[in-house]
Amino acid sequence: LASVPYGPIYKWENDLAVRMVAITGSGAPVTHNKLLISDTSRFVFVFGTNAYGDTALDPMLIRWSSQETFTDWTPLATNSAGSLRLSRGSAIIAVKQSRQEILVWTDTTLYSLQFLGGSAGWGATLVGENISVASTNSVAYANGAAFWMGREKFYSYTGQTQTLPCDLRSYVFGNFNTFEYQQVFAGNNERFNEIWWFYVSEDSDNITDPIANKYVIYNYQDNIWYYGDMER
């Protein structure tokens, strides 16, 4: 499956001349911001999407297909397709699959999405308030925890949301290009127990088209931070 923001979901058809085919009909989303396939529960999710029977994008709406299929999105008593709308925040920014839940970040909150079964399908629990998340890709998952960069601090989630103490906080956010939050990208270097964040600083050499030029690293085993520059 392929996710095209503000468009439908596409599937790959290897034996057709046009191999990218939009999924239509059966209540399939006509617009969405993010897509996630749960490898544990076998559902396809879209985040920030249109309600069933509508075409307008709701930035706080979550929908899921019927289990074990990506083509059936019409909520019926005979299938497991459904939807829910988050109440806190103004838009869904990031999502991440963890071991037992799907974590959903809005611009101000963190939700835990868990499978309830039966007619309820999935339910969302608020697990973090008054937070921020820098970008869609600013979250990494490692060692049973989610780590992410916010707009002025770092956070972790291990069943509860906490501010992550960082002795480089002033260094990072005091020289941060705040117009380029969307470029923040997180990665997990599991071999060395590290979470990396790449970001654009105010002193980036490329002024007209800034690109990530610095990184900050958190070693979650030794609980230490380090940083560096990226040569471009």
Annotate each PLM feature.
Residues 7-8, 13-37:
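Asp-box/WD-like beta-propeller blade repeats and closely related beta-sheet repeat scaffolds
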Residues 18-26, 79-85, 123-129:
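A short beta-strand motif characteristic of beta-propeller blades
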Residues 27-66:
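Solenoidal tandem-repeat scaffolds enriched in leucines and small polar residues
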Residues 43, 51, 87-232:
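Beta-sheet-dominated scaffold domains
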Residues 58-69, 212-222:
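Beta-propeller blade signature
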Residues 65-78, 111-123:
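Per-blade loop-tip surfaces of WD-repeat and WD-like beta-propellers in eukaryotic adaptors/scaffolds
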